[in-house]
């Protein structure tokens, strides 16, 4: 397609967000999850309520939270006020100190009470290999799914060894693995493993927490060529590779900007240029050692 040069207006989107298919209860069954969602990491409860309300107004229909974020109640209030419960895909997570079968069941009930609505996707936040029990925790997720309390289950921050251990113990791979992934940390080997085993890849910190990535000359040159922002280029790069992304912001203009990524398509040349930015720079904790 012809590469645009005009600046994209930041307007409320009406185009439906593409979805990915998550494995549900049985092999061959799947549920649809929006490919672009809204994250609320490091956002307090009151600010999360306002940010989610704005995100819903803009057009987001997927929200990602967690018990440890301390903002499930604010997210729930925003969803209830918007009256979009049936239309929004909701994800939350069990924290490391709630690992174990019974503890996870109790943690799920507490999260659901704080959110005030059904949870679509429940994730193990970290494998916590030194202190946690991700196998027992995942068995609890399987029970919640079998009972119809949650539609799909998955994990976050699992490396290949963790995924193989989990599969050996419970007989299945998770539907999704939410991991740190951005142009400087592309996790190519893990992504290949995901593709081989039908695991959806979801990127947290998809923009690399801002900073160097959004000022990188490769990214800014592409942004200038397309008449969009650096953040929009990076989000588009993720989406064109089939990933789920959950950018975070509390600024209304940025919330809208991050959603306005469906009016252009990066060329293969641009995609290849971004692929060359991978330098193995991890910004968050190492899943092999992090225990929370």
Q: Could you describe each region identified by the protein language model?
A:
Residues 36-46, 93-101, 127:
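Active-site mouth loops of central-metabolism enzymes
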